[in-house]
Amino acid sequence: MKGFHAFCVILLIFGSVSEAKFDDFEDEEDIVEYDDNDFAEFEDVAEDSVTESPQRVIITEDDEDETTVELEGQDESQEGDFEDADTQEGDTESEPYDDEEFEGYEDKPDTSSSKSKDPITIVDVPAHLQNSWESYYLEILMVTGLLAYIMNYIIGKNKNSRLAQAWFNTHRELLESNFTLVGDDGTNKEATSTGKLNQENEHIYNLWCSGRVCCEGMLIQLRFLKRQDLLNVLARMMRPVSDQVQIKVTMNDEDMDTYVFAVGARKALVRLQKEMQDLSEFCSDKPKSGAKYGLPDSLAILSEMGEVTDGMMDTKMLHFLTHYADKIESIHFSDQFSGPKIMQEEGQPLKLPDTKRTLLFTFNVPGSGNTYPKDMEALLPLMNMVIYSIDKAKKFRLNREGKQKADKNRARVEENFLKLTHVQRQEAAQSRREEKKRAEKERIMNEEDPEKQRRLEEAALRREQKKLEKKQMKMKQIKVKAM
């Protein structure tokens, strides 16, 4: 019984103590539940440390409607004691926001966002430049110019072809009646008549005729304007030019005498006298008027001697020159024809150019550039004049005095040429001798056999001594003749 009473006393004491503690918590208005387990307080703290607080998401909007998300990291002080963590969390929630503590924070730029992404700049483009033909005016001009050039090329090429064919159709019967071969293109070994023009390019056509007495052949060249070139077409608007027909007849040496003669437009003769080798050497006087023979004022004459002019200006030739003066550019007869002057970079040529007995005719096509196929018929009488001139050149012969004068003129021209080129020929001969000596020395030095090398040197010395002796003998002969 005593044990039972002692147990009751202990229960009463324990109950009074627990009731006193419960009253104390009510006064402080902070109620905490206690479990029967004495370590319940520690278990609650452990659970708080394991469960992480949810991360707070802060969403900020800027002026360009861009959003950035910032995540708060975990507290680095989780490894500290649990009571300090609870007290710190409670303090942050209970303490009011201090404006002075975060002063200037919002003014700082967000360096992390600027590094990760560059700002986008949107440029306002004017609406009239986006979908307008004015934006492509340069391309439009280039395409238009290209199309114009192509169209002009096709049209100009076709027109030149039509003009050439019209000329050939008009003159074909006359040519075939005077020449055996008409239209040889030179591709075959044997001369064959093709009966058509040879196109050299878009504006030049050739026709070779042969098989006639007193001449080797006749080359006809149709030189049309460059109608296929747009720039040339624009240039001709400022300065009109005519199409031309050039006829070159190569005479046999025995069928033409020695003389140089030319007749044609005054400006054309002045230009030819400067450019052509034979006219500049044998017709040094200025072009003379042909009024003495009844020629129009637009025509002038260049002649080596008066006898040639009198012989060429017969009635029929005067008829052609008078009636077709507007179509005649120049007529050039020469036994010393070599073409234009040869201009070399280093002085005069060392030898006279090769010459041929030639009759050269240059005619202007009517129309001054605005030519039509029907205008080619007007050139047919001029072709008759060419045929007549071939026969005239064969029949014409100089008298004895004229022949002697012509020979003196040719000897004078050759002598003047030799004087001009004497120094150059001496320099050329000296360079050839030095080159020959140099080659001989190299051959001697390259000889491996000493005995043979010695013999070659002795032979070279003997040759030099013989040359010196010959020069000395010539000098003695000159002195004897002078005495």
Swiss-Prot record:
Note down the stretches annotated as region Disordered: 44-118, 424-483
Q: In its keyword annotation, does this UniProt entry include Lipoprotein?
A: no
- Positions in the Cytoplasmic compartment: 21-135
Q: Which UniProt keywords apply?
A: Chaperone, Coiled coil, Endoplasmic reticulum, Glycoprotein, Membrane, Signal, Transmembrane, Transmembrane helix
Q: Would you identify the family this protein belongs to, as annotated?
A: Belongs to the CCDC47 family.
Assembly = Component of the PAT complex, composed of WDR83OS/Asterix and CCDC47. The PAT complex is part of the multi-pass translocon (MPT) complex, composed of three subcomplexes, the GEL complex (composed of RAB5IF/OPTI and TMCO1), the BOS complex (composed of NCLN/Nicalin, NOMO1 and TMEM147) and the PAT complex (composed of WDR83OS/Asterix and CCDC47). The MPT complex associates with the SEC61 complex. Interacts with VCP, HSPA5, DERL1, DERL2 and SELENOS.
Q: What is this protein called?
A: PAT complex subunit CCDC47
Q: What is the species of this protein? A: Bos taurus
